[in-house]
UniProtKB/Swiss-Prot annotation:
GO cellular component: cytoplasm
EC category name: transferase
One of the protein's GO biological processes: ubiquitin-dependent protein catabolic process via the N-end rule pathway
Family: Belongs to the R-transferase family. Bpt subfamily.
Disulfide bonds: none
Main location class: cytoplasm
Keyword field contains Heme: no
The name this protein goes by in its record: Aspartate/glutamate leucyltransferase
Keyword Transferase assigned: yes
A GO term, aspect molecular function: arginyl-tRNA--protein transferase activity
InterPro entries membership: Acyl_CoA_acyltransferase (IPR016181), Asp_Glu_LeuTrfase (IPR017138), N-end_Aminoacyl_Trfase (IPR030700), N-end_Aminoacyl_Trfase_C (IPR007472), N-end_Aminoacyl_Trfase_N (IPR007471)
Keywords, sorted A to Z: Acyltransferase, Cytoplasm, Transferase
Length: 238
């Protein structure tokens, strides 16, 4: 693959086959890019063909017998919150939010609590600072943090990549004690708001996996587009 910006070839490798972390009984294999020459412009283009970031590595599923992972994005100029999403925004009007590039101990403490209480049965448990940094941070693209506060108390964080044409939602976490606030939904809505304020065309949400309940919520944000073999297509779901 060539970067249009520099015409420098980009090497794409393929991982070994290993058990899928999302679907029981399935096997996973990834196309992986780990290049020092990556930059936000090129990554924006890679997002548009289905790649995703984890740390400094860029990957895309290429599983031997499964195609359940569907790249999904929101066209920001067309996105309209549903009635339920509007209620979530209204219910959280007492909270404040801010954008920062600063990585803080409070962010990590909240992440640790979230993983210990919500994902103690998953591959990210037990949490550690080194795992957190390797998963979320990238040497060629500074992360953007959307922080949500109740007074001075940090309630939720969305880690987001800011790119020339889009935002990419990397990971979100929140205080499990505040489940009634639907903070996960609020963080997606705030990322949509930020994308609109920054005049971005898309918010990339990663992969939609219908067969995994924890990964199927992304279809609730409409209209959305799914990457198919024919290109990006709007959902037919009303």
């Amino acid at each position: 693959m060539n970067s249009n910006a520099s015409n420098t070839p980009i090497a794409i490798g393929i991982s070994q086959i290993f058990p899928c972390s999302y679907l029981d009984g399935q096997q996973e294999q990834l196309l992986v890019i780990q290049e020092e020459t990556l930059d936000p412009i090129l990554f924006d283009r890679l997002l548009a063909i289905g790649f995703r970031r984890s740390g400094s590595a860029i990957y895309k599923p290429r599983c031997p017998r499964c195609s359940a992972c569907q790249p999904i994005r929101l066209p920001i100029k067309e996105f309209t919150p549903s009635k339920r999403q509007k209620r979530t925004l209204a219910h959280n009007r007492d909270l404040t939010w801010r954008i920062t590039s600063e990585h803080t101990e409070a962010q990590y403490a909240l992440y640790e609590k979230y993983i210990r209480e919500r994902h103690f049965d998953g591959p990210m448990f037990p949490p550690s600072k080194s795992q957190y940094e390797q998963f979320l941070f990238c040497h060629w693209l500074p992360a953007t943090f959307i922080e949500v506060y109740d007074g001075n108390r940090l309630l939720a964080v969305a880690v987001t990549d800011t790119l020339p044409n889009s935002l990419s939602a990397i990971y979100s976490y929140f205080d499990p004690d505040e489940e009634r606030r639907s903070l996960g939904s609020l963080l997606i809505l705030l990322q949509c708001r930020l994308a609109k304020l920054q005049d971005k065309e898309f918010l990339y949400l990663g992969y939609q996996i219908d067969a995994n309940r924890k990964m199927s919520y992304k279809r609730l944000y409409r209209p959305y587009q799914i990457l198919t073999p024919q290109g990006w297509e709007y959902s037919q779901v009303c």
